[in-house]
Amino acid sequence: MNFIDQLARAERLHDSLLCVGLDPEPGKFPGAWKGDAGKIFDFCAAIVDATKDLVIAFKPQIAYFAAHRAEDQLERLMAYIKRTAPDVPVILDAKRGDIGSTAEQYAREAFERYQADAVTLSPFMGFDSIEPYLRYADKGVILLCRTSNPGGNDWQMQRLADVPGQPRLFEHLAHRAQTEWNRNGQLALVVGATYPAEIARVRELAPTLPLLIPGVGAQGGDAQATVQAGLVCDASGASTGPIIVNSSRAVLYASAGDDFAQAARRVALATRDALNAASAAARR
């Protein structure tokens, strides 16, 4: 089953657009685990167990593991999710961006070492920086397009004078991803929840692509505005490409106590329900 089909299955089974990001910070762990990088797997596995029936995907961020020399714990976690939540696709948030043989090795890392179902990439170096990943025909390749950070304006909002119509960089990327780059139907785009107008513009340019939308929760994105911008429906109520709305810190650190997993579930459930309410409104 390819990544797009996995998303559709998880959305249907769990009635969810919510992706829980797994960004472990040992300094925020509860109780006796606080500050202990050796507990990264245990913490993340507890979050997975508490939320796996509420999500469309999980998204571990590789830097939060690598910084603590915990890549082995990430491997364990990926295998654990595959075993205990086999209907939930896993997005490896790596944001790699390189070319040639280096890109080939990064692709092997994501899809062979970690067995991810999809990976995030920076496409700044062009198509040959993503092509090695597209050789894995059943995997998702998710390109940074319009990111939620303020510095995204430095490049993404600049107009391209040499391209007909002088689109902004993020618009040009969305168009390319929807058309000539999407040879096997594997591509998706990252669009930050803090910019609903740009989500709507990306959806206009890339009507069938999945959109991974971070920024709901701790970064201040509004769930209703996010869903209404990204989920466009026709007269029959059928929607365009799926949306994957990520929340990380708001779920992971809902409590600093021993009830952290239960608190994470409560926040995940409330977020899922808010997204579903917005989805229902968008379909009317």
From Swiss-Prot:
It is an enzyme of class 4 (lyase). It catalyses: orotidine 5'-phosphate + H(+) = UMP + CO2. Pathway: Pyrimidine metabolism; UMP biosynthesis via de novo pathway; UMP from orotate: step 2/2. One of its GO terms (molecular function) is orotidine-5'-phosphate decarboxylase activity. The active site is at residue 95. Keywords: Decarboxylase, Lyase, Pyrimidine biosynthesis. The keyword Lyase applies. Its EC number is 4.1.1.23. The keyword Lyase applies. InterPro entries: Aldolase_TIM, OMPdecase_AS, OMPdecase_type-2, OMPdeCOase_dom, RibuloseP-bd_barrel. This is Orotidine 5'-phosphate decarboxylase. The gene is pyrF.
